[in-house]
Amino acid sequence: MSTMTDIGASGALHRTRSKPWYKVLYVQVLIAIVLGVLLGWVSPHLATNPWIKALGDGFVKLIKMVIAPIIFCTVVSGIAHIQDARKVGRVGVKALLYFEVVSSFALILGLIVGNLVPVGHGLAAKPDAGAVAKYVDQASHMSSVDFFLNIIPESVVGAFAKGDILQVLLFAILFGFALMALGERGHRLRDVIDDTAHAVFGVIAIVMKAAPVGAFGAMAFTIGKYGPAALGNLIGLVALFYATAALFVFVVLGLIAKFVGFNIFRFVGYIKDELLIVLGTSSSESALPQLMEKLERLGCSKSVVGLVVPTGYSFNLDGTNIYMTLATLFIAQALGIELTFTEQVTILLVAMLTSKGASGVTGAGFVTLAGTLAAVNPALVPGMAIVFSIDKFMSEVRALTNITGNGVATVFVSWWEGELDHDRLQANLNRTIDPSDVETAITTG
């Protein structure tokens, strides 16, 4: 693969530079987002038309349609290509250790910022408990035992049908080990799975052409339904969350990136296409396949990418972690409830558990917030209605932070494993090798 990706790099780079700006995907998505905002602002009635909403929802469903097969193929392929079974366990342990440490930093950062900048004080909130009843009901059934049992699918077909990432991941790991145990007898099936992965990535390439349409519909509906007035006094929380997420990405993740040997700003620029897609859809899952492919091109080990990225979507949700602690403090402040130091430590410990597997729950961060509040102090639960109307605006930054965090985690674990191609890493981040050329070379190869 490295040979294919090296051939004709300079020629493709020239072609990319000469490509009209309006044909570049991230430019199209950015324009679509701006147009969506304008439509939602100028004509809320038109923007909230079900067909406008369907544009965004439809695009996200198209992406989610291939999430399960992508995860299955990449994880199985990654394990099957490893000759030493101990390596899989080693990579998994390193990834989980990294997730716990960095997730703890995210949770603590949310607590610190929420205490230093108490934007919830003085709101005199009057929450509507009924607005969040369904989320609390979902969260009330979530326990550590239920979470563990939910990882095990009742049937393989059911796991794929529901698109449950953790269940598909478990089956893929078991299948990968079984295929690896077959030795040479399993090589033909392994090659078929590799080819299937390439075909599914081809489907993704086709679907991605509709990304601007999906981003337009999602953004137009959001602005049209909620509008700038919906933020009201809550604009402080939104701004504070944005600033805290940026602080985490460029300082915490920036230090990790510097330790490994790359620049976080260049890395963010490298995955800008994926970030813009996530911004338009508010779903980090919508960019999962493209992120995995780009990380491989960046120089990360295929086996590490196949294990770390899917696992990170359930165990390394940095944006969701920041949101949970920050939103919990905000709700307490708005309701006039003073949380003691012990209660805040309890929030931290509980959130470390409830944040795991958030991607497998409808409502993601909002549902896990319900679980955290219910476990720490039930009196805080009705206050969820305070942030309910602006959760959509914060979900975008949650998703952006999550995908960036998982990207950095994959590079770090690849480096930790000694399987990071530093030359290719620097070449891609410095734009001496254009990502689109590598994609073309892999496809044609």
UniProtKB/Swiss-Prot annotation:
Keywords: Cell inner membrane, Cell membrane, Membrane, Symport, Transmembrane, Transmembrane helix, Transport
PROSITE patterns hit by this protein: NA_DICARBOXYL_SYMP_2
InterPro entries associated with the record: C4_dicarb_transport, Na-dicarboxylate_symporter, Na-dicarboxylate_symporter_CS, Na:dicarbo_symporter_sf
Compartments (UniProt record): Cell inner membrane
Record bears the keyword Ribonucleoprotein: no
Membrane topology: Multi-pass membrane protein
GO CC, alphabetical: plasma membrane
GO term, biological process aspect, one: L-aspartate transmembrane transport
Gene Ontology molecular function: fumarate transmembrane transporter activity; malate:proton symporter activity; succinate transmembrane transporter activity
Family in the record: Belongs to the dicarboxylate/amino acid:cation symporter (DAACS) (TC 2.A.23) family.
UniProt protein name: C4-dicarboxylate transport protein
Species per Swiss-Prot/TrEMBL record: Rhodopseudomonas palustris (strain BisB5)
